[in-house]
Amino acid sequence: MRPALVATLAGGILLAACAEAGPAPQTAPGGKATLLPEDRLALPEFDLATYESLIVELRGTPVVVNVWGSWCPPCTVEAPDLATVSREFEGRVQFLGVDILDARAPARDFILRYDWQYPSVFDPTGAIRDGLGYVGQPITLLYDREGKLVFEWNGVITADLLRKEIRKVL
């Protein structure tokens, strides 16, 4: 991911998280920080135009976009696989989550529960999904280095299928 874009996404997430900062996180067994609800990640709100601009800006890097919701049972099924595959391709493929039709607190909890290390944006009305012409969720989209959509999957995606499709664009 381009350094400026990483800084923008990370800065937006961290700035919002720090704006509400309270006491320092408690360390849980295993060395992971347990954040109090008021200290958890804030998801930047996106719309279709911002999403499309982001895909253009990321040209040169393959991008996996996953449209999800914390309330979506199939999304919970695929969440661990997304975390695993995103780590396997870290530095070579940019992952981006798009949380739709959700409330911020459950969305933050979902991200923390599945230990996603990639950015996720907040689309409370589902405008991005609807604007792209999809129905239902989860949806996984893969864009090649030129920013062209080369693979789409509506429903639960497996780690094996996602790996196979990513390898085609590397």
Functional labels for PLM-detected ranges:
Residues M1-L48, R163:
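N-terminal targeting signals for export/organelle localization
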Residues A42-V63:
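A short beta-strand-turn-helix
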Residues T61, R92, Q117-Y118:
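A generic structural signal for alpha->beta connector loops
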Residues T61-V63, W68-W71:
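Short pre-active-site segment immediately N-terminal to redox-active cysteine/selenocysteine motifs
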Residues N66, G97-D99, L141, E152:
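Soluble periplasmic/extracytoplasmic beta-strand elements of cell-envelope proteins
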Residues S70-V77, I139:
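C-type cytochrome heme c attachment motif
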Residues T76-Y114, P124-G131:
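Structural microenvironment flanking redox-active thiols in thiol-disulfide oxidoreductases
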Residues D109-Q117, P124-L170:
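Thiol/disulfide oxidoreductase modules built on the thioredoxin-like
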